């Protein structure tokens, strides 16, 4: 825990993105003790997403610098210490294709590269997450069968998606600002 905390304090990344289990491991390793083990409770998926989101914010509040956490899964979660957003875009097929997590991280990095302040970085993370999910939805429409054709369609969708498509398809769940 102390080594992880020290490394993060030294590097001060703008964001960390991972799937639910990777973010859960980060939180569990941090010893936040916020009950995020509910994440693995398949019987209560909504509770699990909420528990992970709460755990993410609790963890971020322990840091001495601003950072964003993005967790991808059934419903993507974007969290900062004082804001939380659930992104509902995406396709279940994304989890069955190797490399989509890496693609999502690259999209996030590109969006964050143009964000100049903490609030803008949070919005950039939300839109990057939605953008990747929308590309996954478009790919599913383009390649209704097979993971190989889906992977190619996803790359095609990422390179041809328009601002109008994003605006017409974006699906955000509850977005809230939390006072410290």
Stretches with model-predicted labels:
Residues 20, 50, 102, 118-122, ...:
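Electropositive phosphate-/nucleotide-binding environments in soluble metabolic enzymes
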Residues 25, 98-131:
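Short, small-residue alpha-helix embedded
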């Amino acid at each position: 825990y102390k080594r992880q905390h020290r490394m993060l304090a030294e590097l001060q990344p703008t964001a960390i993105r991972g799937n639910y289990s990777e973010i859960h491991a980060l939180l569990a390793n941090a010893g936040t003790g916020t009950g995020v083990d509910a994440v693995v409770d398949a019987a209560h998926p909504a509770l699990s997403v909420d528990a992970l989101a709460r755990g993410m914010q609790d963890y971020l509040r322990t840091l001495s610098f601003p950072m964003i956490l993005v967790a991808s899964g059934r419903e993507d979660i974007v969290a900062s210490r004082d804001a939380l957003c659930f992104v509902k875009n995406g396709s279940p097929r994304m989890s069955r294709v190797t490399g989509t997590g890496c693609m999502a991280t690259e999209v996030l990095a590109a969006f964050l590269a143009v964000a100049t302040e903490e609030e803008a970085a949070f919005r950039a993370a939300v839109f990057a997450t939605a953008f990747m999910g929308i590309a996954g939805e478009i790919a599913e429409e383009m390649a209704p069968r097979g993971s190989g054709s889906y992977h190619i369609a996803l790359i095609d969708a990422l390179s041809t998606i328009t601002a109008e498509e994003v605006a017409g398809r974006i699906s955000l769940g509850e977005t809230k600002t939390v006072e410290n």
